[in-house]
UniProtKB/Swiss-Prot annotation:
Membrane topology: Single-pass type II membrane protein
Cytoplasmic face of the membrane: 1-3
HAMAP family documented for this protein: I_SPANIN_LAMBDA (MF_04137)
Keywords, in A-Z order: Coiled coil, Cytolysis, Disulfide bond, Host cell inner membrane, Host cell lysis by virus, Host cell membrane, Host membrane, Membrane, Signal-anchor, Transmembrane, Transmembrane helix, Viral release from host cell
Listed GO biological process terms: viral release via disruption of host outer membrane
Protein known as: Spanin, inner membrane subunit
Function: Component of the spanin complex that disrupts the host outer membrane and participates in cell lysis during virus exit. The spanin complex conducts the final step in host lysis by disrupting the outer membrane after holin and endolysin have permeabilized the inner membrane and degraded the host peptidoglycans. Host outer membrane disruption is due to local fusion between the inner and outer membrane performed by the spanin complex.
């Protein structure tokens, strides 16, 4: 009977060792998978934060763009209205000018032969074109500066 007991004991010990090895193997796998899960969860959280930040920045940039686009459109409309008013005679464009002197010998005394100083039509158009471009450039510059100050930090 000693021999049978020894064989059974050896088999039980082998089974216990094999089961211990299997349990240890699966425990190591569980620890590895848990570490991978935790790492992926951290990366997912970070990615979600980045996405939220990007979406917030996109909304801010869209609002900033809408604001300056509206200001630019308003400035252009004001410039066009001013141009139309000057062309229709409802408003006057005042620019410092000097009239050329007329020889006194060729004119009668006390008679005003010269018209008031006025810009040529092309110069008037050029003035409004330059004014419009200046306003456009100024609004674009203000928008770009605000974008840089708010978004590029």
């Amino acid at each position: 009977m000693n021999r049978v007991t020894a064989i059974i004991s050896a088999l039980v010990i082998c089974i216990i060792v094999c089961l211990s090895w299997a349990v240890n193997h699966y425990r190591d796998n569980a620890i590895t998978y848990k570490a991978q899960r935790d790492k992926n969860a951290r990366e997912l959280t970070l990615a979600n934060r980045v996405i939220t930040d990007i979406q917030m920045r996109q909304r801010d940039v869209a609002a900033l763009d809408a604001k300056y686009t509206k200001e630019l459109a308003d400035a252009k409309a004001e410039n066009d209205a001013l141009r139309d008013d000057v062309a229709a005679g409802r408003r006057r464009l005042h620019i410092k000018a000097v009239c050329q002197s007329v020889r006194e010998a060729t004119t009668a005394s006390g008679v005003d032969n010269a018209a008031s100083p006025r810009l040529a039509d092309t110069a008037e158009r050029d003035y409004f074109t330059l004014r419009e471009r200046l306003i456009t450039m100024q609004k674009q510059l203000e928008g770009t500066q605000k974008y840089i100050n708010e978004q590029c930090r």
